[in-house]
């Protein structure tokens, strides 16, 4: 018997569960990261009304920029007291000793300032000593193998002295020399910074007389007239000539202004305010400057100085004793006239110079264009003695002349005042620390 069992097919059902994870986080009012909690800088827009100093970049030549309120390029150069300088690698910069404010490098290399090397130099020491220029003002030389930037101040920190020069406010002006024009700097301590591998600085003697070229141009003939740059008050007889290619940072007292003179244009300037002037070589300064004095009344400088010389025809004398007497007499007369004219001219010059000195016009010079002129608004020629600080401590004498000891009260406190009426004395004011004891004493007296 064959049993055939037909089994039911076994079917298993598996439940598939699809679970989707949902995370609900409450959004905080402000998300503050660790970086924000520890940051030490702010966005540039939060700092307003101030110039931003940008880090130096790849440079081929030095860049000088004055910081502050700058005026028009045709009238005023600047009124700033800070000079920002960006320097390329291997180009030295010379700064007046004590004027360096800051050194900072580029963003890509934060260690670029570590390669800056410094040294102290005294350029043109012997020439400055000969021409009466302060030769003890050294210059700090900075150079680096990577580009860097610096800030330079218009004031130089110097060693303290009893007599200190009253410098006052100073401002910067930036000169760019392209090799076509030279600059004659008459204020020898005004060069605060300079840079340029082909920049040349030299010292030359100030011309005492104008050139024949200028004398003929003004119609003076071959007569010599002074430039007015040298005087017995001013012991400096030299000036600094800047030539070549480079950048120079000059400082002046007060504000610095630029004047551009066209051809044959003339201007009168107090020589103490003249900072610099463009020249063509070291011997061109005598071709544009002449001393000027204000004439007295209706006197003209040209008329008084350029009077035509009358050439007399030679006289013939008879070869006898009377002719010799006439010849001697005429020679004596000519000598007397020359002496009288010299005395008159000398007295007129003294009178004119004295008048100009009293009214303050003795330092004026005339400059003839075409020239570029830099003038400073203030004059630095005064010295001040700093005030002596007084001690705030009060010294109390211990003993007086009558050998009575003066004791200083060491305790302080609050006291109550009261008044009593005493016979024969009237109102008597007294003080007491406690009213209770005083009231008891008054009660005992009344009993």
Swiss-Prot record:
Keyword GTP-binding on entry: no
GO biological process, one term: inner mitochondrial membrane organization
Localization of this protein: Mitochondrion
Keywords: Mitochondrion, Transit peptide
Superkingdom, natural source: Eukaryota
InterPro entries named among the record's database cross-references: AIM24 (IPR002838), AIM24_sf (IPR036983)
A GO cellular-component term linked to this record: mitochondrial inner membrane
UniProt keyword Mitochondrion present: yes
Main location, first listed in the record: mitochondrion
Transit peptide residue numbers: 1-29
Family: Belongs to the AIM24 family.
Designated name of the protein: Altered inheritance of mitochondria protein 24, mitochondrial
Organism whose genome encodes this protein: Candida tropicalis (strain ATCC MYA-3404 / T1) (Yeast)
Gene: AIM24
